[in-house]
Amino acid sequence: MIEVKGKFITLAGSLMSLYPEQREKADAVLFRRTGKHWNELDPDGFYDTGIYKSFLDAYCEGSITGEKALITLGRNYFPTIKKLGGIPDNINDELDMIVFSTRSFAEDHKGSGIRPIKVMKARKGDVVLDIPDCGYDCRLGEGVYLGILSIYGIDNGLVVQERCIKKGNPTCEFHISW
């Protein structure tokens, strides 16, 4: 079983304020499994990614954009982490932040089969990442990297998924350019 830190479930729950019925539905799954609500979780405690996925699915269900809402959700991750002081001082630019996000992923997940994100290429303006499957829709990752670029004022960056496990590839690969 793969697990994710509670801070991501809490963030998803907080971003679902526009969709209270869907948040309650996902929160009921969480409460049945843990005895806690989305805003009561230990931010650094680990919880089954199936619970997190129930929040992601409910978020999509509530949004008029459907699964594209995951891009919006992902875009909020690192800007929120930055606002909360969770970015090390030695992160100087978008390239540093993308590389940091690969280490952060490994620290924020645990379980059988989890592996770090592999950096295939990392040059200013051009990054390729090999991302493991955690059962999340890949649009979440697309949003994460667009959100990182936006922190540095880059609004015209591109995140292109070149390979996908769900399409029969052995791994997911994202090409990030700006």
Residue ranges and their predicted role:
Residues 36-139:
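Amphipathic interaction/junction segments at domain boundaries or subunit interfaces
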Residues 1-65:
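N-terminal leader/assembly segments
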